[in-house]
């Protein structure tokens, strides 16, 4: 069998019978068993029984037989739903989230539920109950979070794609740390129905894939049209570099990202430095206020709609992560955010969106570009520091607050710690973003050429 380079070509190989869906399933299960130390999945039961099989009645659909995993805050009918927390252990969903239904309709097979940071409230996926997610490409280092199990499952070759959620960077941070692609679409692009929330304002369903091209292919299918983005059809463009996002970088992160820009300049991409001081100040008023105010009511309403009968305090009483427990206790007590403060932050969010529109127009740019995470991937021994959360989301949270589509791609050199480079576009310009960044990744050439489990 020839090398399968892209998700689209893997789909074609399945459709043509070059590889059998059952064989792809067995390879995924074998890889998961061999790499069990990574704790990519939350399995309440054996993996074989929880890994779906291709429905031959669906043959001919675009993703027929394709294994896809889901972060464990996403409802999958008949599978456990834990949101990564001990207090929900044993709860089984009786419904599919909207995104699961969409992917099933396209022929995808549910591979299982991915481990995550407890209740999505962190960026390390160090989970005291379900186990720490390992980093497949940097053993001993943090996999990122909160969609860490999803990123690790893709990076290790267990599955070619996974679905996660992103509130302030929870898809893009682990993607960057694990050396893959993470895509957060324009907020609201895909329904969050059937997902255990953090914040209805900021939460977003997104994709973890090997490449931006794969993300673009999936985006097209989920949008109702099959499309790919060949380099020859995509001209270089003008990209803004926000000053704040390029400041105070780890040396290794800076070198990798600057080197990537240098390669792109040689092929005609234009970069302009942007003073974003007023944007930074406005953005900081939303970062924690909005999600921490919305979390408690959103979680309670979501659990009620899913048939949870024990109340949220049953869950909070069993939280294992000390940082998560501290955040919850503080904001249920003296740190509770006042309604007036929350409403003011929402108004700032509307202003931020207008300012981003103005910034793109004023500088005549199509994209923003910046290092996904300003610090290097931390060793697990040093990752669980309370201050690391703010450091990790420093750059990613702007897209979340301004509701921009955002994508990270790997730019770290082989043999070194992974580094991610992110790009944002204006709201609603997801296809443009994916087209441009698919071209960028082909210029940079930092993509591993073969899906590990398909050769």
Curated annotation (Swiss-Prot):
Pfam families for this protein: Amidase
Listed GO MF terms: hydrolase activity
Pathway: Plant hormone metabolism; auxin biosynthesis
Classification via InterPro entries: Amidase (IPR000120), Amidase_CS (IPR020556), Amidase_dom (IPR023631), AS_sf (IPR036928)
Keyword Ribonucleoprotein: no
Annotated PROSITE patterns: AMIDASES
EC class name: hydrolase
Transmembrane parts of this sequence: none
Organism: Pseudomonas savastanoi
Protein purpose: Hydrolyzes indole-3-acetamide (IAM) into indole-3-acetic acid (IAA).
Gene3D superfamilies noted in UniProt: Amidase signature (AS) domain
Keyword GTP-binding: no
Name of protein: Indoleacetamide hydrolase
Active-site positions on this chain: 71 (charge relay system), 146 (charge relay system), 170 (acyl-ester intermediate)
Alphabetical keyword list: Auxin biosynthesis, Hydrolase, Plasmid
Family: Belongs to the amidase family.
EC number: 3.5.1.-
One annotated GO biological process: auxin biosynthetic process
């Amino acid at each position: 069998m020839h090398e399968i380079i892209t998700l689209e070509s893997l789909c074609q190989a399945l459709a043509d019978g070059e590889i059998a869906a059952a064989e792809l399933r067995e390879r995924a299960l074998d890889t998961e068993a061999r790499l069990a130390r990574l704790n990519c999945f939350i399995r309440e039961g054996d993996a074989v029984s929880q890994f779906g099989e291709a429905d031959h009645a669906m043959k001919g659909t675009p993703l027929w037989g394709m294994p896809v995993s889901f972060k464990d805050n996403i409802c999958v009918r008949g599978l456990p739903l834990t949101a990564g927390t001990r207090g929900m252990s044993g709860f089984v969903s009786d419904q599919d989230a909207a995104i699961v239904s969409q992917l099933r309709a396209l022929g995808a097979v549910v591979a299982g539920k991915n481990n995550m940071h407890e209740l999505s409230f962190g960026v390390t996926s160090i989970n005291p109950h379900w186990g720490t997610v390992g980093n497949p490409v940097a053993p001993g280092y943090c996999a990122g979070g909160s969609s860490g199990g999803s990123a690790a499952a893709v990076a290790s070759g267990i599955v070619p794609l996974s679905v996660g959620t992103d509130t302030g960077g929870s898809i893009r941070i682990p993607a960057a740390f694990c050396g893959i692609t993470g895509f957060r679409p324009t907020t609201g692009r895909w329904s969050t129905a059937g997902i255990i929330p953090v914040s209805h304002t900021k939460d977003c369903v997104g994709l973890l894939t090997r490449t931006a091209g794969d993300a673009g292919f999936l985006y097209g299918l989920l949008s109702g049209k099959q499309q790919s983005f060949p380099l020859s059809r995509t001209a270089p463009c003008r990209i803004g570099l926000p000053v704040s996002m390029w400041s105070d970088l780890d040396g290794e992160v800076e070198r990798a990202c600057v080197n990537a820009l240098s390669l792109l300049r040689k092929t005609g991409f234009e970069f302009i430095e942007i003073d974003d001081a007023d944007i930074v100040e406005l953005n900081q008023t939303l970062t924690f206020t909005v999600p921490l105010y919305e979390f408690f009511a959103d979680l309670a309403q979501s659990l009620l709609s899913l048939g949870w009968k024990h109340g949220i305090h049953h869950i909070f009483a069993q939280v294992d992560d000390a940082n998560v427990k501290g955040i919850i206790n503080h904001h249920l007590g003296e740190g509770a955010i006042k309604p007036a403060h929350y409403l003011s932050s929402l108004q700032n969010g509307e202003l931020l969106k207008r300012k981003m529109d103005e910034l793109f127009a004023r500088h005549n740019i199509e994209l923003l570009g910046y290092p996904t995470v300003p610090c290097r991937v931390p060793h697990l021994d040093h990752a669980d520091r309370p201050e690391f959360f703010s450091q990790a989301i420093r750059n990613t949270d702007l897209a979340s607050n301004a509701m921009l589509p955002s994508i990270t791609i790997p730019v770290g050199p082989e043999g070194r710690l992974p580094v991610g480079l992110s790009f944002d576009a204006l709201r609603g310009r997801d296809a443009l973003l994916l087209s441009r960044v698919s071209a960028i990744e082909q210029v940079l050439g930092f993509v591993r050429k073969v899906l590990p489990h398909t050769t």
